[in-house]
Amino acid sequence: SLPNMVIAEGKNSSQIEALLDLAFSQTSPFAIRYPRGSIEYNCDHKCDVALGKWEFVVNNIDSKVSIITYGNDVCKIEKDINDNHLPYNLINALFIKPIDEELLVSIARLNKPIVVYTNDIIKGGLGDSILECLNKNHINAPVYILGVDDIYVKHGSVLKVKESLGLDLNSLYHFIESIC
């Protein structure tokens, strides 16, 4: 990617609006990704975002795993964690580049598995950036990256494509149970 390029994806309309405001105040290239399909709309809730800072959405003291993801999956996973009392931490990596090294290092020091859940290609994506950061900081943490392999993906509805790739939320939760 371009030097000093910022890549971000909000979890809902408020975050996307805040990212737009932030992008206009920057001098470096700034890409805001948006999902195919719909996104949660919440016009009555303003939010602030700081460049390169992630959001700790769910912080469970008794967590078995930390899930790092971004986009509209954050809201869906948060609802599942809260509704089903799942012992998971959830981090919204709304900045895919640059990553929040400070928060990432603190998560890695919990000595719990980290699952990076993306809807994008694995090579060169968020998971690779996370591994690079942990390596740079000499942290050996169990990191699992769930994303799209280096393949051609058939077209279809978002849900059908995710199911065919094993990237639907049920597959995520089954994977987490298999490693914990």
Model features per residue range: what roles?
Residues 9-24:
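Conserved glycine-bearing catalytic or ligand-binding loops at nucleotide- and phosphate-handling centers
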Residues 1, 24-180:
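Thiamine diphosphate
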Residues 3-10, 162:
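Flexible, glycine/proline-enriched loop segments at strand-loop-helix junctions
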